[in-house]
């Protein structure tokens, strides 16, 4: 993932409410589970997608924690 894409994703995530962020994290975790399943049965040809998705989840959780600290 390019740096400009990461920055754009962070900007969009920071605009979301904590509830929306939690929903997005759940969706990404479900997607990660599906990718891991595909990898385990040999259907996933692009293994880098798992790593990228894990990083996206981490970024979303970071933004979510930032918002929670601001409201505390």
UniProtKB/Swiss-Prot annotation:
Biological process terms in GO annotation: translation
An example molecular function term from Gene Ontology annotations: structural constituent of ribosome
Source organism superkingdom: Bacteria
A GO cellular component entry from the record: cytosolic large ribosomal subunit
A Pfam family this chain is assigned to: Ribosomal_L29
Keyword Ribonucleoprotein: yes
InterPro entries: Ribosomal_protein_uL29, Ribosomal_uL29, Ribosomal_uL29_CS, Ribosomal_uL29_sf
Keyword Mitochondrion: no
Keywords: Ribonucleoprotein, Ribosomal protein
Family to which the UniProt record says this protein belongs: Belongs to the universal ribosomal protein uL29 family.
NCBIfam families for this protein: L29
Function summary: One of the proteins that surrounds the polypeptide exit tunnel on the outside of the subunit.
Summary of subunit composition and partner proteins: Part of the 50S ribosomal subunit.
HAMAP family cross-referenced by the UniProt entry: Ribosomal_uL29
Protein name: Large ribosomal subunit protein uL29
């Amino acid at each position: 993932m390019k740096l400009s894409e990461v920055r754009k994703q962070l900007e969009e995530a920071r605009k979301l409410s904590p509830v929306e962020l939690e929903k997005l994290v759940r969706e990404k975790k479900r997607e990660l589970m599906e990718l891991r399943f595909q990898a385990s049965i040999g259907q996933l040809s692009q293994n880098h997608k798992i790593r990228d998705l894990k990083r996206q989840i981490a970024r979303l959780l970071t933004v979510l924690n930032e918002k929670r600290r601001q409201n505390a």
